[in-house]
Each structure stands twice: as structure tokens, then as C-alpha cells.
């Protein structure tokens, strides 16, 4: 990767991400050079944004925790407590079947979050809602694709 940074004449960065945008939508971004710093002046207070990040990994989880399935009876001779149940008369596993497995560590997009405040000095946003991933994790903030109407916005708040 050092060759890429040398060719772009920039210092090595922790994350590299290519983001496509339309020049007529964001005229501020049309004249940016490769490796230039993008500040938070693209968004204002009250804008709706989509936040994409990698959710926290939870490790191996059973079907009750992973897919919110019901558990079996706990007493009266039951041996079926936290198991996924019968798979039916099938050969092999069906794709997408709700079974135990790895939970979390997936790319997640939370849509239509409102920007409450913008700090231009520290280059920070205050976003209302859940942002995926751990503290100090890498997220991508884009303008909302599925904009809410005024009635939906009031119902959400």
C-alpha cells in the first residue's frame, strides 16, 4: 500500500475507502484532490443521514440469542431447553435457516438519523440514534437515501 500513498503524495492513512458521488449534488467535492481532508461542513443541523459501520462482534451464539427464537419447556422431564428444534425432513442445511452461528461483526447501515449539532472546530457531529460499531470505530456518514416525510419524522421523534 505504500506505493499507492507515494503515488498520491500523501502520508499513509489508517483506512482507505473509495466513495462515489455526483459532482452536481456536492459541488464542494468536485475539486478535491486525492487524499484531501473532508471536513464536516457538508452537513447542517437537522439533516438526515445514513450511518454505515461494522457492528460489534458477539462470537458464537445460539438461535435463541441470535434470532430471538422461543425456548422449550424447562421442567416436567423436558430435555429440550435452548435447542433450535427440528430441521424437518431435508437433506443438508438450507441457506438462510435460523441456526446457531457467529453473531455480529457485519456491515450495518442505520437510516435516517438526524444531526443534532455540528462542531466545526473539532470536526465532530452529534447524531441522534444508534451508531453501529465500537467506540472510536470507523463509520461512513452519507446523506439519507430514503428521506422521511414530515409526518414520519414527527412520529419517529
Curated annotation (Swiss-Prot):
One GO MF term attached to the UniProt entry: rRNA binding
GO cellular component terms attached to this protein's record: cytosolic large ribosomal subunit
InterPro entries linked: Ribosomal_uL3, Ribosomal_uL3_bac/org-type, Ribosomal_uL3_CS, Transl_B-barrel_sf
Cell membrane keyword on record: no
One example of a Gene Ontology biological process annotation: translation
Keyword Glycoprotein: no
Pfam family for this entry, one: Ribosomal_L3
Chain segments carrying region Disordered: 57-98
Keywords: Ribonucleoprotein, Ribosomal protein, RNA-binding, rRNA-binding
UniProt record similarity statement: Belongs to the universal ribosomal protein uL3 family.
Functional summary from the UniProt entry: One of the primary rRNA binding proteins, it binds directly near the 3'-end of the 23S rRNA, where it nucleates assembly of the 50S subunit.
Subunit architecture: Part of the 50S ribosomal subunit. Forms a cluster with proteins L14 and L19.
UniProt name for this protein: Large ribosomal subunit protein uL3
Taxonomic source organism: Onion yellows phytoplasma (strain OY-M)
Gene symbol of the encoding locus: rplC
